[in-house]
From Swiss-Prot:
Its main location: membrane. It is a multi-pass membrane protein. This is Uncharacterized protein MJ0288. It comes from Methanocaldococcus jannaschii (strain ATCC 43067 / DSM 2661 / JAL-1 / JCM 10045 / NBRC 100440) (Methanococcus jannaschii). The keyword Oxidoreductase does not apply. GO terms for cellular component: plasma membrane. InterPro entries: Ig-like_fold. The keyword Transmembrane applies. It is found in: Cell membrane. It comes from the Archaea. The chain crosses the membrane at residues 6-26, 154-174.
Length: 178
């Protein structure tokens, strides 16, 4: 019986220690996860397209937010990306809309990501805040397709010749049977 009481007491102490210890985690949320853009080149280039990415801090502590681009979105000669609000702090539970402008300069298809890095705020010398060294990186996929109303002369001529040939052949067959 003494052995049972000792084990029960030890388990109770372990449970109480686990219950009062604090565990901190880091998370974040972004919307939308994907941005698809279609640009009509017949309206002329360059063209500006605006979009918004919403960043939310679901944590109980403030976080730093930094946004960077990858892939084709880094080629400023063809497409330029302007992130209007970058390197900012979010309070616990706060959501912010970040305006983004894509300036498409050349006709092509572009793919890349806008990476949103969320990391805890450093509370200074006294370190009273969250002691996390981790960061969370959330990607937003971006696909830009540039289309135009170019007239493909060669294809149109071939199509017209085929249609006229079929109509002529049909007319000859109808005459023969009449």
């Amino acid at each position: 019986m003494k052995k049972f009481s000792a084990i029960f007491g030890l388990l109770s102490v372990i449970f109480v220690i686990m219950a009062i210890s604090q565990v901190s985690g880091l998370s974040g949320a972004i919307t939308p996860p994907k941005i698809d853009i279609m640009v009509n080149a017949s309206n002329g280039l360059p063209q500006d397209i605006n979009s918004i990415i919403y960043v939310k801090n679901p944590n109980s502590f403030p976080v730093k937010v930094e946004m960077v681009t990858t892939g084709d979105l880094n080629n400023s000669k063809k497409v330029e990306v302007k992130i209007m609000k970058n390197n900012f702090t979010l309070k616990p539970g706060e959501t912010v809309g970040v305006n983004i402008t894509f300036t498409v300069k050349e006709k092509d298809n572009y793919e890349g990501d806008i990476l949103t890095k969320i990391s805890p705020v450093d509370y200074g010398d006294d370190k009273k805040g969250v002691n996390l060294k981790a960061s969370v990186v959330l990607p937003t996929k971006v696909a830009i397709m540039v289309v135009g109303n170019e007239i493909h002369t060669k294809e149109l001529v071939i199509t017209a010749v085929l249609i006229i040939s079929i109509l002529g052949l049909g007319a000859m067959l109808i005459r023969r049977h009449l």
